[in-house]
A protein has these predicted regions:
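Residue-level detector of alpha-helical secondary structure
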Residues: 106, 120-123, 159, 163
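Helix N-terminus capping/helix-initiation residues
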Residues: 16-19, 97, 127
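Short, solvent-exposed loop/turn segments at secondary-structure junctions
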Residues: 65-68, 87-90, 128
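Compact, glycine/acidic-enriched structural inserts
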Residues: 79-120
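A surface-exposed partner-binding patch
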Residues: 1-76, 81, 133-169
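An amphipathic alpha-helical core segment
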Residues: 111-143
Length: 169
């Protein structure tokens, strides 16, 4: 997959239908201090020789440890993805909408044991409308999370539901 030039990254992101909060994170500004948990730095790897997956042009968002996060335009909408810099040929579609991406990021923050009131404040700061639904769904499903597989399945289903709801907005 070709990567948008580093000098064109922010203008291209600003041209997409992305929220001010997501754009701020892509610019290195955190809409809430706890969002540092979801971002380890500006895109570095994709501009310094790391391989990238084949497919449509990638617009890098940020790095998250050894993962690169990005968005690409597809005929049927946006696709948010991440890939390991060590295995770029196996990208993971995180979501098809920004709200779905927030669902993924909020799951990671929940796993860091952030206070629920703080998570609600972060949701308000970034405009994540589905946090109450996510929390209810997780509380109902969590007793079945004995192994990581059930959690992964629940998260995939949640993101699909959030993407579907966001597509109707």
């Amino acid at each position: 997959m070709p990567v948008v030039a580093e000098s064109e990254r922010l203008p291209r992101l600003r041209a997409l239908p992305l929220s001010p909060a997501l754009l701020a994170m892509a610019e290195g500004r955190l809409p809430h201090p706890q969002l540092w948990r979801c971002r380890s730095g500006d895109p570095f790897y994709v501009y310094r020789g790391a391989g990238v997956p084949a497919g449509p042009e990638l617009i890098a968002l940020w790095d998250w440890h050894s993962w690169a996060l990005g968005v690409r335009e597809r005929p049927d909408g946006l696709e948010f993805l991440r890939f390991s810099i060590e295995t770029p040929d196996r990208p993971e579609c995180l979501a098809r909408t920004e709200q779905g991406l927030w669902a993924r990021l909020f799951d990671a923050m929940y796993e860091h044991d952030l206070d629920l009131d703080e998570l609600a404040a972060i949701a308000e700061a970034v405009g994540y409308r589905h946090w109450p639904l996510q929390l209810r769904s997780r509380e109902q499903a969590e007793p079945r999370f004995g192994d990581g597989l059930m959690h992964s399945q629940w998260l995939e289903e949640l993101v699909a539901a959030v993407d579907a709801a966001a597509a109707q907005d």
